[in-house]
Amino acid sequence: MSTPAESSDSKSKKDFSTAILERKKSPNRLVVDEAINDDNSVVSLHPATMEKLQLFRGDTILIKGKKRKDTVCIALADETCEEPKIRMNKVVRSNLRVRLGDVISVHQCPDVKYGKRVHILPVDDTVEGVTGNLFDAYLKPYFLEAYRPVRKGDLFLVRGGMRSVEFKVIETDPAEYCVVAPDTEIFCEGEPVKREDEERLDDVGYDDVGGVRKQMAQIRELVELPLRHPQLFKSIGVKPPKGILLYGPPGSGKTLIARAVANETGAFFFCINGPEIMSKLAGESESNLRKAFEEAEKNAPSIIFIDEIDSIAPKREKTNGEVERRIVSQLLTLMDGLKSRAHVIVMGATNRPNSIDPALRRFGRFDREIDIGVPDEIGRLEVLRIHTKNMKLAEDVDLERISKDTHGYVGADLAALCTEAALQCIREKMDVIDLEDDSIDAEILNSMAVTNEHFHTALGNSNPSALRETVVEVPNVSWNDIGGLENVKRELQETVQYPVEHPEKFEKFGMSPSKGVLFYGPPGCGKTLLAKAIANECQANFISVKGPELLTMWFGESEANVREIFDKARQSAPCVLFFDELDSIATQRGGGSGGDGGGAADRVLNQLLTEMDGMNAKKTVFIIGATNRPDIIDSALLRPGRLDQLIYIPLPDEDSRLNIFKAALRKSPIAKDVDIGALAKYTQGFSGADITEICQRACKYAIRENIEKDIEKEKRRSENPEAMEEDGVDEVSEIKAAHFEESMKYARRSVSDADIRKYQAFAQTLQQSRGFGSEFRFENSAGSGATTGVADPFATSAAAAGDDDDLYN
């Protein structure tokens, strides 16, 4: 026996927040296994297990499954059954709502009576076309001399003659469970049971909610404990909590959780949809609320679930209508002024917790507010497994990979993704499916399975719902599309890809990754292109913010826009926020140019600064700014911690120009005699955009020539129909040197020398302001000076650009 101090010490190390979710070990909890003999009323256990539970062969036992379902069976011993397992067939499993591998509990059931009367009806889709008397053909042989136990509400399958028929136990007398003895009367008159009524899909249990393990534990503590064991709270002497407010983005499963809790606790579930309460008559709306609470009290223990609670309980000072205020007051008195409402728990759900009246958000009304957020990778995997458990998946589907690729998706988005993948699978089979036919070939149905390819296509077509407004195309630009700029690419990968792909390394070195990058340089050098490539390469979500869009004419609206964008980015983290033309919103403050709409630009900048620095380190949100006027950007933005890495993107040198030509002409057919190297040599001082322009113009000339040739050919053909075979040769099938020569006549440089001098001067002043420490050495590190002496990698690129033979000879 350990000393109390020790045991309490070991306890304190354990995390108790999810203790309620852990399975309790006890001998009567058994794991479900597949049955060998297929009998609906028999389960088999290992003799040792039966001995532990004090059962004898042939005893009737009560088995409890999920979602408050239970049934009665006969226990048999089976040596081959492993120790903590219980073998049951499919019918029993579906009555208990369990699958193979789930845990059920077994209880003795000594007081089962012989039934006087049972009422049994068939299920409609299994008796179509069955002729003759069902009782004689199916039920009589099934129950004859078998002494089968039945439970009211169970379904069972009877095999007979040609086919099997499913029956449902509608009513049993004298109790819910009884044994059908030879003298029991069996009624089977009545309409067959409809299958739709049976398979209620809204029977969700805890197994159908994924990705919210911690929140689920809190909710079960607050709901199940008071409803099932109220004496726990009594013995300690506290009042059990009364209300829970679930909040989070739409689609994260708030209503689903409430429904699962209601099904699993077996409590009476009363759902109030916010707007339904409202009525045009005075006093009517409040009485509707009162009725709902009264109804719930009558059927205690019960759960009242108010969906979209922000619609009926908005802040009283902000609402104009008298009715809304009265409803809020009524809700407050019902929730707190109640003669301590016994066993009634109120759950509310909303995605705008801050628009609810603050009086509701205190202890005693909504005690606990639980954030049902966007699930992480493990959570997404859980959700995907839940949604695909009934899907027919091919072998190659890699759910873990999919969960890695779906950053920022909530449960609803993942469900949509699975549906989209299934639709994709159906589309492929569309050529063999005829819509007019009444039925589809069984072969086709069996051959359908959702493959990894389908999921990939679906991933391309869907994006997280948090980003629906700022529709984000992850652009199709890869590193190969960008010529040159090797240094910049490496730096970018380190800034953005490492924190997303290797977060554990940053933890190991105890550092939070840098969050911001500013590209500056002459127009047309690929700043925007780089941002697109990084968004594509590192699988993060990508929001592009155009600077001027943020400014609006309304006071305070512009700052709200900035706030909203950052909120969205955090919700769908990891996310790259790309501010193009940053200088339009981040000009130096106090410029007082008079025409900036009452200082709107200054306020936007202040909002930006607070958002960037007040950003939670937990979320991976990167900011990339691009500008070609770095000199007018406010210096507060350029400090480390906001946009810490200032990357100068110079005009391309010869190698880079060659790469840009290659990247631009990657998909075009080019004649053998075109020397791209010569073009690259000749285009000294051209920006990337200028070079692309040259290529486009050359293509245009080739196309023009091609079309002219076609017209000429048509003409010749119409004049001389016989001679058309010979001259199919002189097609213009590629871009020739002549086209490039023609195009070079119109080529122009978009960046003047004066501009370049400006950029380089700026880059060098930055370099000087940064280069203070380049001579620094630790005292005893004479030998390792080589490693520490390397300055910022961009010193080289900026200097190289500067030394480029004084601009260019």
Swiss-Prot record:
Record's protein name: Cell division control protein 48 homolog A
Location of the protein in the cell: Nucleus; Cytoplasm, Cytoskeleton, Phragmoplast; Cell membrane
One Pfam family named in its UniProt record: CDC48_N
Record: residues binding ATP: 521-529
Keyword Membrane appears in the UniProt entry: yes
Any GO MF annotation of the entry: ATP binding
GO cellular component terms given for this protein: cytoplasm; cytosol; cytosolic ribosome; Golgi apparatus; lipid droplet; nuclear envelope; nucleolus; nucleus
GO biological process terms held by the UniProt record: cell division; negative regulation of defense response; pollen germination; pollen tube growth; protein destabilization; protein transport
PANTHER family on file: AAA-FAMILY ATPASE, CELL DIVISION CONTROL PROTEIN 48 HOMOLOG A
InterPro entries: AAA+_ATPase (IPR003593), AAA_ATPase_CDC48 (IPR005938), AAA_ATPase_domain (IPR050168), AAA_lid_3 (IPR041569), Asp_de-COase-like_dom_sf (IPR009010), ATPase_AAA_core (IPR003959), ATPase_AAA_CS (IPR003960), Cdc48_dom2 (IPR004201)
Lineage: Eukaryota, Viridiplantae, Streptophyta, Embryophyta, Tracheophyta
Modified residues (N-acetylserine): 2
Membrane topology: Peripheral membrane protein
Comp. bias regions, Low complexity: 791-801
